[in-house]
C-alpha cells in the first residue's frame, strides 16, 4: 500500500528497531499520528536526548551521563572482581539483585562469525588492557547461555588465563539459549553464587 511520505519514513524508522516488523511499525506510526502534538514532540526529544546526553564509560563501557560511570566511581565496590557482560541491559539486571558488589565490563555484543563479528569488533581489547593495568583477581564471564555467548566466554578465558587471573562462569540454571536480562533476580543470584572456574 502507498502511504504519504512522512508515514512511510516513520514506518521505515520504526522497523530499524529490533523485533519491530512491518505490521508493528505501521501500527506504531499510525498511533504516533493520533497522539497529541506535545506528546510527539516529547517522544522525539527523548529519542534525541538519549543519543546526545548519554555516552559510554571509558573504563567499563556501560552507558552513562558522566564519565566514568557511577559504578566505576563507587569506591565501595570490590575492585578485584570484574563481571563481563554482553550489553548494558545485563548490567541493569545484575544490579537489580543487589548482591554483586564488583565492577563490570560491557562488551556490546558477542563473537558471532556467522554475522561477521569477531573479537576486535566488540569491547574485548579494552578488557585485556584493563586487566593489565588494574589489580583484578577474578573475572566473572556472564555471557548469555547461547552459542555466541559460550564462544565469547571461551575466547576470553583463553586470553586471560595466561595473565594469572581466576576466570569463572555463571552457574547454569540460566536456560540455554536465553538472555541474561530476562532472568529473574533469584536465578541470577544463584548463578553468581554457584559460578564455576573455567
Curated annotation (Swiss-Prot):
Residue intervals passing through the bilayer: none
Zinc finger (C4-type): 57-72
GO biological process terms held by the UniProt record: double-strand break repair; recombinational repair
Cleaved signal peptide residues: none
Record HAMAP family: RecR
Function of the protein: May play a role in DNA repair. It seems to be involved in an RecBC-independent recombinational process of DNA repair. It may act with RecF and RecO.
NCBIfam families attached to this UniProt entry: recR (TIGR00615)
Name recorded for this polypeptide: Recombination protein RecR
Gene name, Swiss-Prot/TrEMBL: recR
Amino acid at each position: 500500500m502507498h502511504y504519504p511520505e512522512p508515514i512511510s519514513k516513520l514506518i521505515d524508522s520504526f522497523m530499524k528497531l529490533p523485533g519491530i516488523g512491518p505490521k508493528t511499525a505501521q501500527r506504531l506510526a499510525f498511533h504516533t499520528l493520533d497522539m497529541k502534538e506535545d506528546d510527539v514532540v516529547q517522544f522525539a526529544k527523548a529519542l534525541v536526548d538519549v543519543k546526545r546526553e548519554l555516552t559510554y564509560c571509558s573504563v567499563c563501557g556501560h552507558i552513562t551521563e558522566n564519565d566514568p560511570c557511577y559504578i566505576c566511581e563507587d569506591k565501595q565496590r570490590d575492585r578485584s572482581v570484574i563481571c563481563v557482560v554482553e550489553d548494558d541491559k545485563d548490567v541493569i539486571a545484575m544490579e537489580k539483585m543487589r548482591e554483586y558488589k564488583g565492577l563490570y565490563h560491557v562488551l556490546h555484543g558477542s563473537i558471532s562469525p556467522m554475522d561477521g563479528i569477531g573479537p576486535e569488533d566488540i569491547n574485548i581489547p579494552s578488557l585485556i588492557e584493563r586487566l593489565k593495568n588494574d589489580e583484578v583477581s577474578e573475572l566473572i564471564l556472564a555471557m548469555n547461555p547461547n552459542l555466541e555467548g559460550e564462544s565469547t566466554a571461551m575466547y576470553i578465558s583463553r586470553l586471560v588465563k595466561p595473565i594469572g587471573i581466576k576466570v569463572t562462569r555463571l552457574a547454569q540454571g540460566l536456560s540455554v539459549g536465553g538472555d541474561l536480562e530476562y532472568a529473574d533476580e533469584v536465578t541470577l543470584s544463584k548463578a553468581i553464587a554457584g559460578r564455576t572456574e573455567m
